[in-house]
């Protein structure tokens, strides 16, 4: 698409929503809409003032349906139930979506897959360029080490995060499991307590830390005899996630209807490991 994409932000009043508004402005794209819950006291507020960048002439709306016609693409970092409703509206209108909502159920993910047969959808647990490059490195490490190491995923986030493990940790685990020909649902071990017995090398362990204002940290350990390799990504602010999501929004407009991920956006699927 040659013209600057018209981008709508859902959950505009949240921390991520405000950062997304800033990212749209920094990228030079058009903020076409900002949406909050209809009962929110922020409805009617200038979206730019809300995000701390000054007036942009876009008022926060309490209804996605009312502003959808003004948008080429919607960015949604809200909650699973809300995202499911937004998908239905965007599917009917043929408006592209970029979804960063985590904690979705298998049923909700199936609904997303179905909607993506009607309108293009980018879905990723993490839109950071660094995280997605890290995942490519994890695939390489898993391919080289194979079954000769124990694998542990450790993630840390702020005290307000409600889902665990993080979507990014699971995304990393899935990438490793797929590379090794394992089913993550069968081999994942979430935390350990009591007499657990010897470790099964086929398993992939997950540990979760919640506290303070940690934006997001992920470390994957490939632990062998006499050595270990660690791949770590640390986010110090939310702008890297927001900038990646805005990049995905500009990329997906005009694409054929299907589900994409950040590896598609960044061209990482073309990089062989």
Curated annotation (Swiss-Prot):
Associated pathway: Amino-acid biosynthesis; L-lysine biosynthesis via DAP pathway; (S)-tetrahydrodipicolinate from L-aspartate: step 4/4
Localization terms from the record: Cytoplasm
Binding site for NADP(+): 37
Listed GO biological process terms: diaminopimelate biosynthetic process; lysine biosynthetic process via diaminopimelate
PROSITE patterns: DAPB
Entry annotation: catalytic residues: 157 (proton donor/acceptor), 161 (proton donor)
Gene Ontology molecular functions: 4-hydroxy-tetrahydrodipicolinate reductase; NAD binding; NADP binding; oxidoreductase activity, acting on CH or CH2 groups, NAD or NADP as acceptor
Database matches in CDD domains: DHDPR_N (cd02274)
InterPro entries, per database record: DapB_C, DapB_N, DapB_N_CS, DHDPR_bac, NAD(P)-bd_dom_sf
Pfam families per UniProt: DapB_C, DapB_N
Major location (coarse): cytoplasm
Enzyme class, spelled out: oxidoreductase
The reaction(s) this protein catalyses: (S)-2,3,4,5-tetrahydrodipicolinate + NAD(+) + H2O = (2S,4S)-4-hydroxy-2,3,4,5-tetrahydrodipicolinate + NADH + H(+); (S)-2,3,4,5-tetrahydrodipicolinate + NADP(+) + H2O = (2S,4S)-4-hydroxy-2,3,4,5-tetrahydrodipicolinate + NADPH + H(+)
GO CC annotations on file: cytosol
Keywords of the record: Amino-acid biosynthesis, Cytoplasm, Diaminopimelate biosynthesis, Lysine biosynthesis, NAD, NADP, Oxidoreductase
Binding site for NAD(+): 11-16, 36, 100-102, 124-127
Superkingdom of the organism of origin: Bacteria
Binding sites annotated in the UniProt record for (S)-2,3,4,5-tetrahydrodipicolinate: 158, 167-168
EC code(s) of this entry: 1.17.1.8
Family membership noted in the UniProt record: Belongs to the DapB family.
Function field: Catalyzes the conversion of 4-hydroxy-tetrahydrodipicolinate (HTPA) to tetrahydrodipicolinate.
Protein name per Swiss-Prot or TrEMBL: 4-hydroxy-tetrahydrodipicolinate reductase
Protein species of origin: Acinetobacter baumannii (strain ATCC 17978 / DSM 105126 / CIP 53.77 / LMG 1025 / NCDC KC755 / 5377)
Gene, per the UniProt record: dapB
């Amino acid at each position: 698409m040659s013209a600057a994409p018209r981008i709508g932000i859902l959950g505009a009043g949240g921390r991520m929503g405000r950062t997304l508004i800033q990212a749209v402005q920094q990228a030079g794209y058009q903020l076409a809409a900002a949406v909050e819950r209809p009962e929110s006291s922020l409805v009617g507020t200038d979206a730019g003032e809300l995000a701390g960048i000054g007036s942009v002439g876009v008022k926060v709306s309490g209804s996605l349906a009312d502003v959808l016609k003004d948008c080429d693409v919607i960015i949604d970092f809200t909650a699973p139930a809300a995202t499911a409703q937004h998908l239905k509206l965007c599917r009917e209108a043929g408006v592209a979506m970029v979804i960063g909502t985590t904690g979705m159920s298998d049923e909700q993910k199936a609904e997303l897959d179905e909607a993506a047969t009607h309108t293009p959808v980018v879905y990723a647990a993490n839109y950071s360029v660094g995280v997605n490059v890290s995942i490519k490195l994890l695939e390489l490490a898993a391919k080289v080490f194979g079954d000769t190491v124990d694998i542990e995923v450790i993630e840390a986030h702020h005290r307000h995060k409600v889902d665990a493990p993080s979507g990014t940790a699971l995304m990393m685990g899935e990438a490793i499991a797929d590379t090794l020909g394992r089913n993550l649902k069968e081999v994942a071990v979430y935390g350990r307590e009591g007499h657990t017995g010897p470790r099964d090398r086929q398993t992939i362990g997950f540990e979760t830390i919640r506290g303070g204002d940690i934006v997001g940290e992920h470390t994957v350990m490939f632990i062998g005899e006499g050595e270990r390799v660690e791949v770590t990504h640390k986010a110090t602010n939310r702008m890297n996630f927001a900038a990646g999501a805005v990049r995905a929004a500009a990329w997906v407009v005009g694409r054929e209807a299907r589900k994409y991920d950040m590896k598609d956006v960044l061209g990482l699927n073309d990089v062989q490991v």
